[in-house]
């Protein structure tokens, strides 16, 4: 019975894509000198709209990455995607001195983002997005700012429900705006 459960757990792990974003060597100063350890930042996603990030620390790199991956799987969020490939609307996220701007993009644009943000979008399964990092370029701040923005992503049905209007009315207004701008 226990053997079968392990096999099932491994199958579930295979559905996730993990990306190592950053590794940092840290030192603890002790009487005899310095003790070195490693801190890892990992992004995990199922490429279907779920993504999470985690931070792990250990004396060896593989152990730090494993801890970060487990932490990322525990803290996953769901992000609704338009047509399974891009954002529904533009977003802004902040964390510390880090600020990111995320914009939805037309089909074929690709992922136009740097560093840690690209890893998040690839793990999320997003295909078209334009992202700009402003302020801090610290990977931890950029990842947390990107997640702050993604948490505020709303499906148009939810927006229509909040406004108390029909979804079809909201879609008609959107099409009208696209026709006027284009």
Curated annotation (Swiss-Prot):
Record-level GO BP terms: translation
Keyword RNA-binding: yes
SS bond partners: none
GO terms for MF: rRNA binding; structural constituent of ribosome
Domain S5 DRBM, first and last residues per copy: 16-79
Gene3D superfamilies: 3.30.160.20, 3.30.230.10
Keywords recorded for this protein, A-Z: Ribonucleoprotein, Ribosomal protein, RNA-binding, rRNA-binding
Classification via InterPro entries: Ribosomal_Su5_D2-typ_SF, Ribosomal_uS5, Ribosomal_uS5_bac-type, Ribosomal_uS5_C, Ribosomal_uS5_N, Ribosomal_uS5_N_CS, Ribsml_uS5_D2-typ_fold_subgr
Top-level taxonomic group: Bacteria
Assembly notes: Part of the 30S ribosomal subunit. Contacts proteins S4 and S8.
Job description of the protein: With S4 and S12 plays an important role in translational accuracy.
Family recorded in the similarity comment: Belongs to the universal ribosomal protein uS5 family.
Domain remarks: The N-terminal domain interacts with the head of the 30S subunit; the C-terminal domain interacts with the body and contacts protein S4. The interaction surface between S4 and S5 is involved in control of translational fidelity.
Protein name: Small ribosomal subunit protein uS5
């Amino acid at each position: 019975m226990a053997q079968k459960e392990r096999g099932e757990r491994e199958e579930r792990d295979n559905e996730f894509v993990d990306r190592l974003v950053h590794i940092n060597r840290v030192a603890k100063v002790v009487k005899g000198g310095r003790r070195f350890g490693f801190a890892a930042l990992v992004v995990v996603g199922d490429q279907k709209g779920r993504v999470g990030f985690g931070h792990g620390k250990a004396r060896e790199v593989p152990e730090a990455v494993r801890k970060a991956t487990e932490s990322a799987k525990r803290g996953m969020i769901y992000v609704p995607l338009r047509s399974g490939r891009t954002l529904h609307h533009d977003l802004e996220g902040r964390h510390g001195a880090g600020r990111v701007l995320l914009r939805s993009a037309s089909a074929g644009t690709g992922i136009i983002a740097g560093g840690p943000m690209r890893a998040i979008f690839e793990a999320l399964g997003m295909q078209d997005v334009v992202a700009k990092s402003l302020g801090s370029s610290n990977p931890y701040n950029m990842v947390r700012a990107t997640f702050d923005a993604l948490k505020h992503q709303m499906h148009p049905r939810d927006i229509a429900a909040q406004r108390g209007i029909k979804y079809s009315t909201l879609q008609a207004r959107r099409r009208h705006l696209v026709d006027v701008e284009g």
